[in-house]
């Protein structure tokens, strides 16, 4: 017997009638007549009263289904297949946990005596990749600590990985302070196509939050280095991340306009909300409601949309849920998530072969599964959300303090409406 899917969301605003379904990630505009007909049939729990042609269209986008649980089981099956797929190898490599910055909010803590990656560890990484002979692609993210402190290690290890002949892509998360012309020019040969650099605001705000270990400012030099990247690494996209909390969110537009006025084609800028994983009662982290107020204000007052208001629909979980996704420390120690880097209790093994903590490994692969969570299974966004960040889900399971639901969860109608407005603007602009 067919029924109205629980993964539908139907609403009207400003004389427009809209229907969203997360099983198919479809979003359609309805006539007022069809909207009223569907609403009446839903109230009677009888979809057979819907016109045959319309009912067939609704079947195609899964708004009418026989069994929602079966549809969710298919999605879960696909996720499990991906978790244990061996066609891609994703490595986050930390050549050092040391850093030249002394940022007070850094989740990694202070690694003043962090060892440097040795030739032995480098060779073990290459042998590890060779053992994964079924992998068709190799994706590397250079992380730390500050990866630019060990740029020579990045070069030697990259050249060895490229020599393996596997399809290769790389990115880097860096504070950007140690770039120079030589390093910028080298990015192309190192296949580093994406670099993320953090600025926490304009000069005054940034230098109060992101300073060198000795307390010296960093803003001006980072800006000059971003210009160097735009000039000498034109094939590399530079994304400026602005960490936001209650103390600096109201000044985001200042740094946004500053960067935009540099007119650098390969450079983009986006806000990112700082999460607090500590037990601090005086946290400056913005709660989900304030985050949405911020996003809403940017869109309604300034026409800015930094994140899509529409779910991607690719249903790809974070790489830590995949057996072939791992984080490598400078000693060859293995983690599943880069939030755990430097935490001895989160090391699950070694690049040299042995698994030392199966509990950590299995926890990340299978723990806090949203498909086992009654609240998630009833949630309209489960098919496109897949439970959100696995790290946050595990934290929630252990201490109940971290909210893992996406901002869209409590604001579905607004998000869909904003997406509709943007789509209409694009259509109108094309027709001009």
Label each PLM-derived region with a short phrase.
Residues 4-29, 52-92:
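N-terminal [4Fe-4S]-dependent radical SAM core
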Residues 73-185, 190-193:
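Conserved alpha-helical substructure of the radical SAM core
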Residues 98-108, 374-391:
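Local cysteine-cluster metal-coordination motifs and their immediate loop/turn environment
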Residues 110-113, 208-216, 395-396:
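Short glycine-enriched, charge-decorated loop/helix-capping segments at active-site entrances
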Residues 127-145, 402-432:
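Short Fe-S-cluster ligation motifs
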Residues 184, 190-203, 267-274:
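Non-cysteine beta-strand/loop elements that form the S-adenosyl-L-methionine
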Residues 204, 208-323, 329-331, 343-344:
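Radical SAM enzyme [4Fe-4S]-AdoMet core and its adjacent flexible, acidic
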Residues 285-313, 339-386:
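C-terminal accessory region of radical SAM enzymes
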């Amino acid at each position: 017997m067919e029924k109205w899917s629980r993964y539908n969301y139907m609403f009207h605003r400003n004389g427009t009638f809209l229907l969203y379904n997360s099983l198919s990630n479809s979003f359609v505009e309805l006539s007022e007549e069809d909207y009223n007909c569907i609403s009446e049939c839903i109230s009677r729990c009888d979809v057979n009263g819907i016109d045959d042609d319309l009912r067939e269209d609704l079947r195609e986008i899964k708004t009418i289904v026989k069994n929602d649980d079966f549809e969710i089981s298919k999605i879960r099956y696909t996720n499990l297949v991906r978790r244990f797929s061996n066609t891609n190898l994703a490595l986050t490599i930390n050549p050092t946990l040391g850093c030249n910055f002394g940022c007070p909010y850094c989740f990694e803590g202070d690694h003043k005596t962090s060892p440097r990656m040795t030739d032995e560890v480098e060779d073990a990484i290459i042998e590890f990749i060779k053992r994964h002979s079924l992998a068709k692609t190799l994706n590397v993210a250079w992380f730390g600590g500050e990866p630019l402190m060990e740029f020579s290690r990045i070069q030697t290890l990259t050249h060895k990985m490229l020599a393996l002949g596997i399809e290769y892509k790389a990115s880097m998360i860096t504070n950007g302070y140690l770039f120079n012309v030589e390093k910028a020019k080298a990015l192309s040969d190192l296949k580093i196509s994406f670099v993320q650099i953090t600025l926490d605001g304009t000069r005054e705000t940034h230098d109060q939050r992101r300073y060198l270990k000795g307390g010296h400012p960093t803003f001006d030099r980072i800006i000059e280095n971003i210009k160097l990247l735009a000039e000498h690494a034109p094939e590399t996209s530079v994304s400026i991340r602005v960490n936001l909390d209650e103390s600096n969110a109201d000044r985001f537009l200042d740094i946004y306009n500053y960067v935009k006025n540099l007119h650098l084609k390969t450079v983009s800028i986006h806000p990112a909300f700082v999460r607090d994983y500590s037990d601090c009662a005086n946290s400056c982290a913005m709660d989900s409601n304030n985050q949405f107020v911020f996003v809403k204000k940017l869109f309604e007052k300034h026409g800015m949309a930094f994140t899509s208001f529409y779910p991607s629909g690719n249903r790809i979980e974070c790489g830590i849920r995949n057996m072939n996704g791992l984080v490598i420390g400078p000693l060859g120690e293995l983690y599943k998530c880069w939030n755990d880097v430097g935490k001895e209790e989160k090391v699950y093994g070694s690049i040299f072969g042995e698994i030392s903590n199966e509990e950590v490994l299995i926890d990340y692969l299978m723990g806090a599964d949203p498909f086992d969570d009654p609240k998630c299974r009833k949630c309209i966004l489960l098919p496109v959300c897949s439970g959100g960040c696995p790290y946050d889900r595990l934290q929630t399971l252990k201490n109940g303090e971290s909210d893992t639901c996406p901002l869209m969860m409590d604001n579905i109608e607004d998000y869909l409406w904003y997406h509709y407005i943007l789509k209409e603007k694009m259509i109108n602009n094309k027709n001009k």
